[in-house]
Amino acid sequence: MDPPSPSRTSQTQPTATSPLTSYRWHTGGGGEKAAGGFRWGRFAGWGRALSHQEPMVSTQPAPRSIFRRVLSAPPKESRTSRLRLSKALWGRHKNPPPEPDPEPEQEAPELEPEPELEPPTPQIPEAPTPNVPVWDIGGFTLLDGKLVLLGGEEEGPRRPRVGSASSEGSIHVAMGNFRDPDRMPGKTEPETAGPNQVHNVRGLLKRLKEKKKARLEPRDGPPSALGSRESLATLSELDLGAERDVRIWPLHPSLLGEPHCFQVTWTGGSRCFSCRSAAERDRWIEDLRRQFQPTQDNVEREETWLSVWVHEAKGLPRAAAGAPGVRAELWLDGALLARTAPRAGPGQLFWAERFHFEALPPARRLSLRLRGLGPGSAVLGRVALALEELDAPRAPAAGLERWFPLLGAPAGAALRARIRARRLRVLPSERYKELAEFLTFHYARLCGALEPALPAQAKEELAAAMVRVLRATGRAQALVTDLGTAELARCGGREALLFRENTLATKAIDEYMKLVAQDYLQETLGQVVRRLCASTEDCEVDPSKCPASELPEHQARLRNSCEEVFETIIHSYDWFPAELGIVFSSWREACKERGSEVLGPRLVCASLFLRLLCPAILAPSLFGLAPDHPAPGPARTLTLIAKVIQNLANRAPFGEKEAYMGFMNSFLEEHGPAMQCFLDQVAMVDVDAAPSGYQGSGDLALQLAVLHAQLCTIFAELDQTTRDTLEPLPTILRAIEEGQPVLVSVPMRLPLPPAQVHSSLSAGEKPGFLAPRDLPKHTPLISKSQSLRSVRRSESWARPRPDEERPLRRPRPVQRTQSVPVRRPARRRQSAGPWPRPKGSLSMGPAPRARPWTRDSASLPRKPSVPWQRQMDQPQDRNQALGTHRPVNKLAELQCEVAALREEQKVLSRLVESLSTQIRALTEQQEQLRGQLQDLDSRLRAGSSEFDSEHNLTSNEGHSLKNLEHRLNEMERTQAQLRDAVQSLQLSPRTRGSWSQPQPLKAPCLNGDTT
């Protein structure tokens, strides 16, 4: 491609500077290159000051290298003629032009066709069949719009790979911000290439021809499953630059049965490629889209964001729901997107699978179809929905979830699913410049203001969008580090709360670890987790769930599995992500500065094991470690292993709550030192392996559009006070939504809220930065050695008094001649007053201490439309007396104090309310105690009366007993008298009259009886 002409370049640059042109934006057509940049850098220079100007470079860059593509350079135009690779390379070698010759005017439209103003709406291509050839992208490289097969790999379906090559852009991403020290700013990539580059090209061409010839030769053996030798030779010369309508689409793993695949389609053909990881796939998709869709970031487009949760189905016929199983398929406008795993059973069918798609073209209808697993099976039922209903304002924020009746199925058949769709309007990337700047500079302020106002789901979505945007700009690592430190300060050193709550910090850390540690999870847990999911061995150790005879065998099996998982984790330090190591090291340093060094390992443990490794073991399908949810038996095994690993990381033995796991306490004691050593290793920064600079990739405009839509939804329900503290973000969001230019600039530091300003001033802290509009709120610091006159002169906004103004000395006229005169050395004289400064001149000496002199800029709006700058343009009274700003400053301080007192009053009122609530509770408790006391008193009285009655009864019985004893004594005495009387009668002589006269007896007893 020929370089753009200077005339065209001059047309693309604006003549006057404006806030939108403070940064240099690169377009796909013919913009100029950034000075000395290796990367696509629309947002790479946000860290510098807004007024910083980049050095100008030549508008005619040198020829570019064929092996390395500068990402910050404008992409290539689509080629109209099919050029052979060898012809292009040898032509470059034989005739290296030092400067490109200008082409004739009649050939310019033919070589560089103008991009279409309204490109055709892309449609989702037809899904590939399961037996389609899938090519390993590790054997390819991207050279001049061609996917060139380097060779050395035999055809084989879905074979594992150890390493992987990458495209030119991927190589640059892996290298970080490395720059050659000998390279001057403004040189392009071919200028730094050595002379051995052509010889390397010769060797490459020779090897390509030899391998092509070897592949074309007939060989003995069975044909490959991926295709014939001719198909491989055709693919080795695939020139995508000569094709029309080249599109790149990521493929869901369920379509081909293999993860991390993408499809390249063009008019008349398509190819499928597999990658080693999701990060590698994203880099390849980005590089290919930059190559074949160069204007994607510079045009407005509409894309669809879709999330579908397929839960369960009911009411299907027994014959249909039986073996071999039923799948649920997702169709969008007649194109198959994904399918669930097969489920079989006589009752309800459970899937519980989630599908998420981004960057889909505008679509109208979504269809969920239930289909049998057998070949050529018919559709058992379907659900058809219009996406306009799901994207309507009245649609629920969490999505539409219900039982959808199945069309074409028996009555009562239904599918339970949750669907959430959103149509995004993606603007050109330069329209989001201010939004990206605000997020880059003030993400901590934004998270702190929105934290108490968001539910858990909104926090998760906002944190994911922020992490993706900042990862694309290279600032996600700083975001996670700062939020983790803030979470540590919020918890106040309480270990039980570290990373266990649903906050923006925890959600951001989860999203960042999922993005960074995908390869790490695959390398560490992928193989062992897949083996455990496929195993049929039982590891249940709960005595209530397994026989006692099998319990020792199950315990030994679980211990061996935990040993295997733990060994893979502690030996994974060699491929541990360096980005996470830097974050963990920063957290430990923050704990050390706070005097709580013990919390450093706890932070690492809570983030790495509690939020990443153990959840990946529990739910491997959510982290890409398994294609489907495990069966109940393996799921129970994974749950027990996750419990053991988590307790080992927390150094917490099993207690009475899980007494059946007590046999694993010896395992925890044995491997505790190794776990502590691993936590120390991952928190150490390896300088050689640590990444530097930009590490992100992806569609930044799309991620910014998602973030803009979420923030608009959040700010629509936010209170006005919180909005004011986040200015100018609401103004930026409103301008982007209305399609108006953003007329504000993002400061490097936002002013503190009034309460924080008062607290910082009362604590004796000096403000680091203050906006000009906030200067009247603060009294300048005055030392005791300054005189009154110097104090008056040093006042920030006071004008000099009329009596202090000195007459201006008129400059001496300068006479010029035709020749340059010899100037005599000027004598230094005492100035009688300040020189008049002409309009537009620069101040070379110390500025006077009066109000700064400024002039209007033609690039800025003369009447600011933002509310916080209108008061600065209001005319002020020129006759304002000296020191009138003092009461204003004092009033501002008093207002701050009043605001602080109001806050204290609110706190005290809340305290009084809480105390009154406690008093009411104590009063109610006292009433209850009184009632209980009365009840006890009544019961005591009743008991005492019963006791008295029983006591009276006992006294009567005693009296009766005494009477009986008395009667017994009387009877004994009477008996004794009778005995004596009988004896006396027996001894005395009887007379005649004695037999007829009886002896007199004693008086009767007291009770009236006679004896």
Curated annotation (Swiss-Prot):
<dbReference type="InterPro" id="IPR039360">
    <property type="entry name" value="Ras_GTPase"/>
</dbReference>
<feature type="compositionally biased region" description="Polar residues">
    <location>
        <begin position="987"/>
        <end position="999"/>
    </location>
</feature>
<dbReference type="InterPro" id="IPR023152">
    <property type="entry name" value="RasGAP_CS"/>
</dbReference>
<feature type="coiled-coil region">
    <location>
        <begin position="888"/>
        <end position="988"/>
    </location>
</feature>
<dbReference type="Pfam" id="PF00616">
    <property type="entry name" value="RasGAP"/>
</dbReference>
<feature type="compositionally biased region" description="Basic and acidic residues">
    <location>
        <begin position="179"/>
        <end position="190"/>
    </location>
</feature>
<feature type="modified residue" description="Phosphoserine">
    <location>
        <position position="164"/>
    </location>
</feature>
<feature type="modified residue" description="Phosphoserine">
    <location>
        <position position="51"/>
    </location>
</feature>
<feature type="modified residue" description="Phosphoserine">
    <location>
        <position position="988"/>
    </location>
</feature>
<keyword id="KW-0597">Phosphoprotein</keyword>
<feature type="region of interest" description="Disordered">
    <location>
        <begin position="1"/>
        <end position="38"/>
    </location>
</feature>
<feature type="compositionally biased region" description="Acidic residues">
    <location>
        <begin position="100"/>
        <end position="117"/>
    </location>
</feature>
<feature type="modified residue" description="Phosphothreonine">
    <location>
        <position position="234"/>
    </location>
</feature>
<feature type="domain" description="C2">
    <location>
        <begin position="284"/>
        <end position="404"/>
    </location>
</feature>
<feature type="modified residue" description="Phosphoserine">
    <location>
        <position position="167"/>
    </location>
</feature>
<dbReference type="InterPro" id="IPR008936">
    <property type="entry name" value="Rho_GTPase_activation_prot"/>
</dbReference>
<protein>
    <recommendedName>
        <fullName>RAS protein activator like-3</fullName>
    </recommendedName>
</protein>
<feature type="modified residue" description="Phosphoserine">
    <location>
        <position position="787"/>
    </location>
</feature>
<keyword id="KW-0175">Coiled coil</keyword>
<dbReference type="GO" id="GO:0005737">
    <property type="term" value="C:cytoplasm"/>
</dbReference>
<dbReference type="GO" id="GO:0046580">
    <property type="term" value="P:negative regulation of Ras protein signal transduction"/>
</dbReference>
<feature type="region of interest" description="Disordered">
    <location>
        <begin position="209"/>
        <end position="230"/>
    </location>
</feature>
<dbReference type="InterPro" id="IPR035892">
    <property type="entry name" value="C2_domain_sf"/>
</dbReference>
<keyword id="KW-0343">GTPase activation</keyword>
<dbReference type="InterPro" id="IPR001936">
    <property type="entry name" value="RasGAP_dom"/>
</dbReference>
<feature type="region of interest" description="Disordered">
    <location>
        <begin position="151"/>
        <end position="197"/>
    </location>
</feature>
<dbReference type="GO" id="GO:0005829">
    <property type="term" value="C:cytosol"/>
</dbReference>
<feature type="modified residue" description="Phosphoserine">
    <location>
        <position position="170"/>
    </location>
</feature>
<dbReference type="GO" id="GO:0070062">
    <property type="term" value="C:extracellular exosome"/>
</dbReference>
<feature type="region of interest" description="Disordered">
    <location>
        <begin position="987"/>
        <end position="1011"/>
    </location>
</feature>
<feature type="modified residue" description="Phosphoserine">
    <location>
        <position position="224"/>
    </location>
</feature>
<dbReference type="GO" id="GO:0005096">
    <property type="term" value="F:GTPase activator activity"/>
</dbReference>
<dbReference type="GO" id="GO:0042802">
    <property type="term" value="F:identical protein binding"/>
</dbReference>
<feature type="compositionally biased region" description="Basic and acidic residues">
    <location>
        <begin position="792"/>
        <end position="808"/>
    </location>
</feature>
<dbReference type="GO" id="GO:0005938">
    <property type="term" value="C:cell cortex"/>
</dbReference>
<dbReference type="GO" id="GO:0051142">
    <property type="term" value="P:positive regulation of NK T cell proliferation"/>
</dbReference>
<feature type="compositionally biased region" description="Pro residues">
    <location>
        <begin position="118"/>
        <end position="131"/>
    </location>
</feature>
<feature type="modified residue" description="Phosphoserine">
    <location>
        <position position="166"/>
    </location>
</feature>
<feature type="site" description="Arginine finger; crucial for GTP hydrolysis by stabilizing the transition state">
    <location>
        <position position="500"/>
    </location>
</feature>
<feature type="compositionally biased region" description="Polar residues">
    <location>
        <begin position="871"/>
        <end position="882"/>
    </location>
</feature>
<dbReference type="InterPro" id="IPR000008">
    <property type="entry name" value="C2_dom"/>
</dbReference>
<feature type="modified residue" description="Phosphoserine">
    <location>
        <position position="790"/>
    </location>
</feature>
